[in-house]
Each structure stands twice: as C-alpha cells, then as structure tokens.
Amino acid sequence: MNRVVVAGSFNVDHVWRVPALPQAGATLSGDYTTGPGGKGFNQAVAARRAGAGTCFVCALGDDLGAQLARVLCTADGIDLRDVVVQAPTGTAGIYVDAQGRNSIVIGAGANAALQPAFVAEAL
C-alpha cells in the first residue's frame, strides 16, 4: 500500500448557510453546522479514502477540537501525529450564501505552530 504523509492544518469549522454574504454592520439569520476541516485534514481524509496509508502531521491545542481530530482520524484509519501546543486548536467561521459563494475567517491557533521538524519526527 502506498503511504502518504500530509502536514497541515486541522480546524473546527463553524458554518452558517445564509441567503447572502453579510455586509458590514449586518445581522443575518442562517442555518448553523459545525464539523472538521482544514486543508491538511481534508487532504489526509481524501488520501485515506482513496486507499493510501495516511499519516497526518498537525499541531493541536489541548481542547475539544483536538479530541475531535483524534476521534475522526482513528475512525478513518489515519495515523495522526499531532503535537500539542499552548494555543487553541484552529477554527474557521464560514459563511455560505445561496449561490454557494463563501467568506471564511480563520483563527489559526495551534496551526501557526506547525514546524518542519514535526514532519521529520513523524517520518
């Protein structure tokens, strides 16, 4: 089996589906969901589901977001190599309008602490 190593971000995504993207000063009502995200995590999941042995290297906080990452990686058979740092796990606030366009604000949190040395240690 091929092995893929992905180094990147894990975020807890907070998603609001709204009729239109918010303008400055606007208050909107929308449907809310939360779930996993982050470019690195999404790539690791895609690689694993395509059949590759997958190692995901990331930085996480010591919080519920980190617990979510661990549970999801275990469930998908992803070898998670996380480094716990003194910052919250990354988050993203995502607004998606009726046409599917989005606006995203991220709180990088622990993702900003990811270092090349973490990857070297995982290999």
Regions found by a protein language model. Name each.
Residues 1-59, 66-68:
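Glycine-rich phosphate/adenosyl-contacting loop at the front of the ribokinase-like
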Residues 20-23, 71-75, 122:
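Short, solvent-exposed amphipathic alpha-helical segments in soluble enzyme
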Residues 35-42, 85-88, 111-118:
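Short secondary-structure boundary/capping elements
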Residues 59, 81, 94-123:
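Conserved phosphate-binding/catalytic loop of the ribokinase/pfkB sugar-kinase fold
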Residues 63-64, 88:
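Short alpha-helical
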Residues 64-76, 94-96, 100:
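Active-site-proximal loop->helix
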Residues 72-87:
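A glycine-rich helix N-cap at a beta->alpha junction
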